[in-house]
From Swiss-Prot:
Pathway info: Amino-acid biosynthesis; L-histidine biosynthesis; L-histidine from 5-phospho-alpha-D-ribose 1-diphosphate: step 6/9
One term under GO cellular component: cytoplasm
Protein known as: Imidazoleglycerol-phosphate dehydratase
Keywords of the record: Amino-acid biosynthesis, Cytoplasm, Histidine biosynthesis, Lyase
Gene Ontology biological-process entries: L-histidine biosynthetic process
Principal subcellular localisation of the protein: cytoplasm
Reaction(s) catalysed (UniProt annotation): D-erythro-1-(imidazol-4-yl)glycerol 3-phosphate = 3-(imidazol-4-yl)-2-oxopropyl phosphate + H2O
Database matches in PANTHER family: IMIDAZOLEGLYCEROL-PHOSPHATE DEHYDRATASE, IMIDAZOLEGLYCEROL-PHOSPHATE DEHYDRATASE HIS7
Top EC category: lyase
Alphabetized NCBIfam families for the sequence: PRK00951.2-1 (NF002111), PRK00951.2-4 (NF002114)
Gene3D superfamilies registered for this protein in UniProt: Imidazole glycerol phosphate dehydratase, domain 1 (3.30.230.40)
InterPro entries named in the record: IGPD_sf, ImidazoleglycerolP_deHydtase, ImidazoleglycerP_deHydtase_CS, Ribosomal_Su5_D2-typ_SF
Length: 194
């Protein structure tokens, strides 16, 4: 079976982004988002989802991190959606509970073709390194919107903000790895389409 791949670009007055990914990869990554902590989170997402990701972003981070973070989530969601094609044979659902030291995150995803985000996490710090923690929820919202998926994310407990954010990214990565897995040759929907 050929590997499922996608390439997406997005150029606005605020950002210039290119992404190439392979769903059936090994978790290889080359990520340059312009936001060091986001690089770390996307590298973790790639490694634990086993999705190969090459991403570059030039953005107006001198103004704020909002535009780059939002647009990266848009291209990541669009690229995964493109690589999934008609979603024939995918498991469709995935879930994971992942610890990161004292923090515990739960993720569930349905690649349903319908966008929705449930997010329950509280961060005690306004930033982790150069990432605004208020943008974590917005990243996942934009990802769900452009992936056309139901994503549920929550921190069950935790103290360290870095650990909470990383546990969210890793739990979604493991859930995604399960959801994109090919398990049959049928579309997993009574409608016949997803």
């Amino acid at each position: 079976m050929p590997k499922r791949r996608a390439r997406v670009t997005r150029k606005t007055k605020e950002t210039d982004i290119a992404i190439e990914l392979v769903l059936d990869g090994n978790g290889k990554y080359e990520i340059q988002s312009g936001i060091r902590f986001l690089d770390h989170m996307l590298e973790s997402f790639s490694k634990h989802s086993r999705i190969d990701i090459a991403l570059t972003c030039t953005g107006d981070v001198d103004v704020d991190d909002h535009h780059s973070i939002e647009d990266i989530a848009i291209v990541l969601g669009s690229a995964i959606s493109q690589a999934l094609g008609d979603k024939r044979g995918i498991q469709r659902y995935g879930w994971a509970i992942i610890p990161m030291d004292e923090s515990l995150a739960r993720a569930a995803i349905d690649l349903s073709g319908r966008s929705y985000l449930f997010f329950d996490a509280v961060f005690d710090r306004p930033t982790v390194s150069d990432l605004s923690t208020e943008m974590v929820e917005h990243f996942f919202f934009s990802l769900a919107e452009h992936l056309k998926a139901n994503i549920h994310l929550e921190i069950l407990h935790g103290k360290n903000t870095h650990h909470k954010v990383e546990a969210l990214f890793k739990s979604l990565a493991v859930a995604m790895r399960e959801a994109v897995k090919i398990t049959s040759n049928e579309v997993l929907s009574t409608k016949g389409v997803i």
